[in-house]
Structure formats: structure tokens, C-alpha cells
Amino acid sequence: LRSALSWAVAEELLRSNPLAGVRGPARPQPRRHHALAEVRQLLGYAEQEVERASAFLVGERASPRRLRSLFSAEQDLLLVRLAADSGARRGELAVLRLGDLDGRVLSIERGLSHGVLGSTKSSRARRVTLGATTVALIHHQFDSWAEPRPTPMGDWLFAPTPARETFMTADALSHKFRRLGRSAGVENPALHRLRHGVATHLVEKGKLLKAQARLGHRDPSTTLRHYSHAVPLDDLDVADELDQVLNDR
């Protein structure tokens, strides 16, 4: 539009360019994400914490404090694994239930916004396929706590206690992740950066539409606007193909 108006002024079709001095919208800054090495560092540390908490229960009566420590460590591990696998928003992670998982397919239908349970940010449900390791971890954590209880156990994936009677808030998950990240030695840990890592990885692989679907964006333009920095520039194969077509006379 700016170029067209400048041309009109040059051709004396307009006296002046109405957009002169008007600045266009700022280009979104690249979303900061946790690199794959950092994610692996987080997973490794979380796994060690689960092993350490489990070791304290061997050979002694399990005290409530020891059990809470083990449950918290397991929740840390699941949080990193599921967030890095699904690309879900923190408000979506907070209200996931075991019943949302069908085989390896996770249905993301709910979200928390300012502490209020409702639909997802895009108001659209979506389904994502999880890695087999993530699914096995979810079932293991539920099965290991499913001993006879006075009351039935709830099915929230992230909960304050092993009873799983209520979900954790999105802020609580963010705090939990930040504390874990600092303990693991990760610089500036933030839960939403795992989501950005999923998007960046997929866009770098040329899978823009799959990134859009996994993140729950309404359209690909949203994904491209925020992650255009990750679009691969390796188009050598395209150049070679066009070169062959042009030379094939």
C-alpha cells in the first residue's frame, strides 16, 4: 500500500502520501524457547529427583512427608515431559484428566483463564498424539498410587496431593516448573518456553501446519507470525529442481 501511494504521488495523481511518517506495526519478536539440550537437562534432573525420593522409601515406613516428596517429584517429571511433548498451554495442562487420554491421543478441551475453568484460549478443542514414553509415564504414575483408598482417587493429571481430588492452578504449575528449572541449573526457566520449543522445532522441520494444529492456533498465519524466524531457508533442492526444469529444453 505504501509503495502504491508513493507511485501515485510520483505520477501526480495525489498531492501527498497519506501514509508519510506513519510507522507500520512492529514485527513480533521471536518467541524465546528452551533449547533441546535444556529440555533434556530438565528431564534428566527430574528423573534423578524421582529416583532419590523413591530411595528414601526403601527399608523404612513411608511417612506422609516422604510420600509427598515422591509425588511432587513425579509431578515435576510429568510436567516437563508432557509440556515438551504436547505443546499445550499452561492453563490447558493444569486441567487435563486421565480420561482425556485415549491410547496415545490426548484431547485438549479445557483451559484455565485467570483461575476460571472454561474452554481453550482459541475456544476450540484439539487432539494431539503423544509419545509412547509420555503415555507410559502417565499410566505408571496413576497405577503406582492406585492402592486401596478410603475414597476413590480423582483423575486430574496435575494435583496438589496423591488423592488428585482437585487440579493445580496454572500459576502453581509455572512456579513448580520455575523451581525445578533453577534447581536443574537452567537459565531463566519458564513453562511457556517448552511450548515455544515445540513450535520452533516443528517449524524448523517445515511442518508449519502441524505446528499450528498442535499449538491450537486458529490459523497458520498466527503460527507463522510468531515463529517466522524458524522457517528453514535450506531450499537447495528447490533451486536444483527449477534449474533442471529451465535447462530441459
Would you name each region that the model predicts?
Residues 20-24, 30-33, 86, 95-144, ...:
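Conserved tyrosine-mediated DNA breakage-rejoining catalytic core shared by Y-recombinases
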Residues 99-105, 188, 207-228:
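Short, polar N-cap/turn motifs at the start of nucleic acid-interacting alpha helices
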Residues 10, 14-16, 20-94, 133-134, ...:
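Basic, Lys/Arg- and aromatic-enriched nucleic-acid-binding interface segment
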Residues 1-8, 22, 130:
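Non-catalytic DNA-binding core/recognition domains of DNA-processing enzymes
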Residues 44-69, 115-127, 132-134, 140-152, ...:
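C-terminal secondary-structure termini that scaffold catalytic or DNA-interacting sites
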Residues 72, 81, 85-92, 172, ...:
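C-terminal catalytic core of tyrosine-transesterase DNA break-rejoin enzymes
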